[in-house]
Every structure is written in structure tokens, then in C-alpha cells.
Amino acid sequence: MALPSSSLSSQIHTGATTQCIPHFHGSLNAGTSAGKRRSLYLRWGKDNQAKKLGPSKIVACAGQDPFSVPTLVKREFPPGFWKDHVIESLMPSYKVAPSDEKRIETLITEIKNMFRSMGYGETNPSAYDTAWVARIPAVDGSEKPQFPETLEWILQNQLKDGSWGEEFYFLAYDRILATLACIITLTIWQTGDTQVQKGIEFFKTQAGKIEEEADSHRPSGFEIVFPAMLKEAKALGLALPYELPFIQQIIEKREAKLQRLPSDLLYALPTTLLYSLEGLQEIVDWEKIMKLQSKDGSFLSSPASTAAVFMRTGNKKCLEFLNFVLKKFGNHVPCHYPLDLFERLWAVDTVERLGIDHHFKEEIKDALDYVYSHWDERGIGWARENPVPDIDDTAMGLRILRLHGYNVSSDVLKTFRDENGEFFCFLGQTQRGVTDMLNVNRCSHVAFPGETIIEEAKLCTERYLRNALEDTGAFDKWALKKNIRGEVEYALKYPWHRSMPRLEARSYIENYGPNDVWLGKTMYMMPNISNEKYLELAKLDFNRVQFFHRQELQDIRRWWNSSGFSQLGFTRERVAEIYFSPASFLFEPEFATCRAVYTKTSNFTVILDDLYDAHGTLDNLKLFSESVKRWDLSLVDQMPQDMKICFKGFYNTFNEIAEEGRKRQGRDVLSYIQKVWEVQLEAYTKEAEWSAVRYVPSYDEYIENASVSIALGTVVLISALFTGEILTDDILSKIGRDSRFLYLMGLTGRLVNDTKTYQAERGQGEVASAVQCYMKDHPEISEEEALKHVYTIMDNALDELNREFVNNRDVPDTCRRLVFETARIMQLFYMDGDGLTLSHNMEIKEHVKNCLFQPVA
């Protein structure tokens, strides 16, 4: 059959409107995207009349042969990587042992008890703060300490090297500060001469080496309190190396900082200076400073600072606070207390990132209810009555509370932005830490539409974190973590909309430090945040879930082979990659059926996409669509062999799915499934019409259809029946074709697909994509500008999707997850290109391997 002349044109009739579209020479065989390769050629029926295709008619212009159409060119895809023999070769020997199940249950119980026992915060002793509390003379006037148990603790807890501090961690700054505080206290009470001498020897040895330690390991307020205590030590006659260059440098830093301090700032509003009042005693107006006392009687939750104020003022509330702390800890005090908000938020974040939060839903809700009850629109600190908010706790709280449906505003971040648009941890601070900027960055990805402050925070923190990665000597200001660099790398490469729960869990299992410590005025630990039990459960649970997933994948591979789909030469075989999608986010064992339905439905969207794209004739495709509409297996006899395989597999699979759905929903769902597929096939057909005649629709016309043809809605609407919830018509309408929620999922999936595939598809004859359609509407702009605009549309849609996900509380949680996570998996698959079709040589292959085949050690 001869190709038509390029000077001839055909017409598309849409209602009363007729458009002439030039025909073209050559193949219309299109590119590689998973959901939009609409390069079907027009086929004409035996009645020698133009076939009616959906809403359009294709007729010939004057002089054109209506039967002259291009010849179909066979499409070829890269072969699938995950063949049966490959999967078998990767199957680990791991099996879920009864002892593992028992240990998992034990750990779940123990961690639940940890959550339920959370009060004001569990933490370790601070020798530094305990020394300051031990200084307080008895209020009855006797020449004894008010808290003799704290003095005894100092005498009993000197380390072998003569220092005081945390035995299993050595930071020179921390040890020197604590040791200096302890030897001063012992000297004041004229006791422990041996301990004092050993402490002095340690100080002399380490003070000369301290410059070798990173400045970022210097505790908060060190340059304020350390020189002040040196002055006390000198007055007490302690033989310390006061003339060392390091000591002189610290003294100079203190003087410079105090000179920069406005005289009225200390009393105007609560600042972090309240944390170090013991180092500012010579300049503090004690009457004025009392106006900034916290409700609990402390000064910024610091026992040392509060002890110093009490010794100067005799304030009863200060004494009540110290009694309260010692009642909790016995014979010592921590570096700050309470830590109730910090502990709860970080514990929730820990179990979520490790992928074990599904075991602790009630405990998480209780913890977040507590935090929300103390939420402040100006921000929060580490404790409920802390008057100085910090961006670390605030950003963590904003992100987690928002994702759990609490009403919190991003305006809270304005507290921490300076006049230059930079973000800092504390008001007036000039330094930032990696962990606080990382938490702000993570928070910035759960933006709602129009939240400019979050967008500013995202840009600021991304810039900071990328610079931090380039600085190989960079350390965090607030924490000593096992692998903070790995955490930052993951967050920048896989931000929220690409970070699938199983991948994040695997990454965080590798990066999580069960012995991580934090830096305040001294080094401290939080056992309800950093704990070996979390890690042990995460590893056992990950491997257990992965074992079940491998079994499910083998079942689906058997379904694929027994249905004859491996014989189909025109389609892509991506069973493992497609199964990885639901396994990466709806991973819990109880959703096995939902994962199977999701995977089978997704495989059919790929098969039928490829079938309608370039393989089937219009007569046969019309017959296929009619067979679905009538649900009539008898029509299969009129189909060619490969289409028989497709329809028989389709018919049998969805009959089985419908029967299972009837049992779960308590009503017939077959007609519902049919209707879902009818809409899907109509969208495929419309794009086939456009592609056949090289019609470039307007952007709006394109998106209206393409957000459906991407097929995500079809997958979700059928899979939702198996989420364990009874779905009423009202619930189904909230995630249905007309819902904003489902539309945004399809829109963002379509746009990320198009932005990564349109160039390759255009080179292979494809004419319609979001970029090309937008350029048609705006011929004055360049391709680069059009692409940028499409990215902007997608980013805005993702923000709106966040809001729909968070606020759609009438929809069961699992259904909301299904919609939202399906949108996110598309962002992952298409982050660098067509991750489905080209999965064999893209990072998706490694994700599949890590998620499904490689247990964590």
C-alpha cells in the first residue's frame, strides 16, 4: 500500500469543526514511556469507509486516498531483566524462623512500653551540671551542700583518666568542661583532694591538644562558661595552664561576644543566653533576669544555669525546679530537663524512618497528641515550657504533625528567618548545624500551595546541605551521628516525593546509630531515641516482610507465565519492577492481596498500552474494547492469537479479582471494575487517534485525557477494594475519577513521565506531550521555557497533592496512602528517565534488588 503524499491532508471532524492535518511519511512508532506511547496507525474496515474513533471522524481531504495509511512497524523493547532464572539466583537462604517471630513480638512490646513510659524525657547524667548543683550551700545556713548526694556522685564518678564525663565517648571540649566544673566544686567543699589532683593532671594533658578537635564539637555556650570558670579556678589557686594559646583564644572569643551583645538584649526576651547564665554572673542584673524565668522555675531547662541563679537570688522556684529534677534522677542531674517534646518527636521520627511505625500506631498518636497540645505558633523548643523555640524541634514537629493530620501552619518558620532570608536554629544565632538544616529541608517538602516561606526554606537548606557535603571536614553542631553524611545524601537525592517507605527504611537502617549522642552544653544521650532495640526490630521486620514479598513475587511470576503473557512479543515484561511499586509503600503483610491486585492491574495497563499503541489494528482494538464493555469471552474467537491471550488473561484475572472483591466488599464489584477499564480504554483510543494523524491538541485538551491514559487511576481504583476497608459509594467518590485527589495523582504522574520521555518519543514520531502541547499554545516561548513551565505546574500540583493527602480525612488511611504513594512512585521511576522501560540499566534495578532480594545484615 502506497504512502500518501505529504501534500495531502486528512480532516478531523469534532462536532461542527473540521481540521485538516497533514499526513506524513515514515514510521509513527513512538518512544518508551510507560503510559503514553500513542502511535497507533489508522486501520480501515472492509466497508471502505472511514471508521468513527471515539468523538472524532477521520475523512480524506479532496484528492486523498482514504485507504493509504502507513504500514505498521514492529516495536521493540529492551528485554526484561528480572527473568525467573535471575530471580532464582538471587533468592537468599533467609527464612522467617519461629525465634525471629517471637523476638519481634518481644521487641514490639518493649518499645511500646518505652513510648508509654515517656514523661519529661530520659537522658544521661551531666557531670558538668551536677557539679554546679553540688555547689549550692544548704539553705538552713549550715556549712554543708544543699544536695550532698550530688557531691557524692562527683566523688564516685571520676573516670580512670582523671576526667569526668560520658565514659564511652570522648570529646576533649566536653571532658575538659566537665572536669573543670567538678574540680572547682570539690575544691569549694574542700574534699576529694586526690580526685582534684587527678583532674588537674587530665586538664593539663588535654588542654594542649584541644585545638586538634573540630570547632563544631565545641559545646553550646562553651566560650561563655569556660573562661568564667577558669577565672574561678584561678581565684581558688588551682594550678592550671592558664597561659596556653587555646585558653587565651577562648577568653578573647568570650570578650568579643560580650562586646557585641546589646546591653538590653539579655533582658528583653528569652534567648539562648539564659542557658549559660552561670558564665555571665558578673554582668547579670539578677532582678531583671527573673522576669525571664520559665514557668517550671528553670532558666531554659538548664540545671547549671538555674543553680547559678538560685545561689545569687535564693529564688524558691529555682529550688523547686532543682528538687523536681533530683527527684527524677536521684543523685545527679542532666544537662537540660525536661526534654518531653524533643523525645516524643524524635522517637516518632525514628520508628517511621526505620519502617516499624506500623506496629506503634496508638503510641504514635498519643505522642503526637501530647506535642500538639503544647504547639505554639511561634515555634516550640525541646520542652513544653521552654520559652526559646528552635527550628530543629519546630520543623520536625511541623512536618510530622502535618502528615498526621494536625492543623499546623508553616508560618511558624518565619520566627527563624533573618532579614537576609537565611534560616537559623535560634533567634539571633549566627551558626547553623547540619541536623537542624536537614530537618528544615525535610519539612519543606510537605508544603501546601502558596506557602512561600516553605519554598524559601527549601532553597536555603538545599544550598546549605550541598555545601556541607562538599566540605569533607564538616561536622554537625548539635549531634554526633553515625552517618549524618549518608542521611543528607539520601534526603537530597530522594526528597519526600521520591522517598518510598521501604527504600527509606533500608537506607536509615544503614545510617541509624543506636548510640548517637547530642551536643548541648555537654554531650548527652536520649535512650528513647537512640536505642539498639529500634534497630534490631527494624532489621528483623525488614527481612521478615521482604521474605513474604519474595513469595508473593514468585506467585505473580507464575500467574504471568501461566496466562501466556511471556509469549507476547509486543509488550514489556516488567513484572518485578511493577510488583516493587506497591511493595515499596504498602508493604505490611496484611496487604498481600492488595499488592497482588495492584501488580496484576498495573501489568495489564502496560500490556494494553503497548497493544493499543502500535500493535493492534483498529478493528481488533475496537473488538477488544467491545469485549470488555460486554464482558463477553465469546468474542475472543474473532481476535488474532496474541490478542486472544491478552483478553483471556484479562477476563479470567479480573473475574477472579471481582469475586474476591465481592467477598471483601459484600457486594458485586464486577460492573465497577468494567467501568474503570472502559474509561481507561477510551483514553487509550483517543490518544491513538491523535497520534495516527499527528494531531497536537491544546495543553488543556491533552492533560484532560493524558491524566487518565497514564493509567494510575485504573490501578488505584481497583486496588482500593482490597485495602481492608468497606468502601461506600461516598468514599469511592472521594477518590474516584471526578475527585481532585485522583486527578492530581494522574496529573503529576503524567507530567513527570512527559518531562523525562518527550524528547526520545518525539524522535520516534510522537507528536503530543505536555511540553509540545504547551509550546503549541504558546508559540512564542522556547522548548526550555515550556519544559520549565511544565515542571512548575508539576511542583505546584505536588504541593496540592500534599494538601489533599493530609486533609482528606474522610477517606480511610490506606486508601489515601494508595493514591498518594502511587503518585510518589512515579516520581521515583521517572527521576532520571524512563525507569520502567529502561529499568535494566537504571537505578530502579538496584531498588528492586534492595527492596525484594537483599536482606539487611
Swiss-Prot record:
Q: Which GO terms describe its cellular component?
A: chloroplast
> Which keywords has UniProt assigned to this entry?
Chloroplast, Isomerase, Lyase, Magnesium, Metal-binding, Multifunctional enzyme, Plant defense, Plastid, Transit peptide
**Quick one: signal sequence residues?**
none
Protein's cellular compartments: Plastid, Chloroplast
Positions that bind Mg(2+) 4: 390, 392
* Locus of motif DDXXD motif: 609-613
Q: Which InterPro entries match?
A: Isoprenoid_synthase_dom_sf, Terpene_cyclase-like_1_C, Terpene_cyclase_plant_C1, Terpene_synth_N, Terpene_synth_N_sf, Terpene_synthase-like, Terpene_synthase_metal-bd, Terpenoid_cyclase/PrenylTrfase
Pfam assignment, any one? Terpene_synth
Summarize where Mg(2+) 1 binds, as residue positions. Answer: 609, 613
Q: How does the cofactor bind to this protein, according to its record?
A: Binds 3 Mg(2+) ions per subunit.
Needed co-factor(s):
Mg(2+)
Under Gene Ontology molecular function, one entry of this record is: terpene synthase activity
| Residues binding substrate, per UniProt | 257, 477
Q: Where does this protein hold Mg(2+) 2?
A: 609, 613
Using the UniProt record, give the first listed, main subcellular location: plastid
Which residue ranges does the UniProt annotation give for the motif DXDD motif?
390-393
The pathway it acts in is: Terpene metabolism; oleoresin biosynthesis
| Gene3D superfamilies with a match to the protein in the record | 1.50.10.160, Farnesyl Diphosphate Synthase, Terpene synthase, N-terminal domain
GO annotation terms (biological process) = defense response; diterpenoid biosynthetic process
The chain's transit peptide is found over 1-33
| This protein's domain notes | The Asp-Xaa-Asp-Asp (DXDD) motif is important for the catalytic activity in the class II active site relevant for the cyclization of GGPP. The Asp-Asp-Xaa-Xaa-Asp/Glu (DDXXD/E) motif is important for the catalytic activity in the class I active site, presumably through binding to Mg(2+).
Protein function: Involved in defensive oleoresin formation in conifers in response to insect attack or other injury. Involved in diterpene (C20) olefins biosynthesis. Bifunctional enzyme that catalyzes two sequential cyclizations of geranylgeranyl diphosphate (GGPP) to levopimaradiene. Levopimaradiene is the major products of the enzyme with abietadiene and neoabietadiene. No activity with farnesyl diphosphate (FPP) as substrate.
Q: Which family does it belong to?
A: Belongs to the terpene synthase family. Tpsd subfamily.
Q: What is this protein called?
A: Bifunctional levopimaradiene synthase, chloroplastic
Gene behind this chain? TPS-LAS1
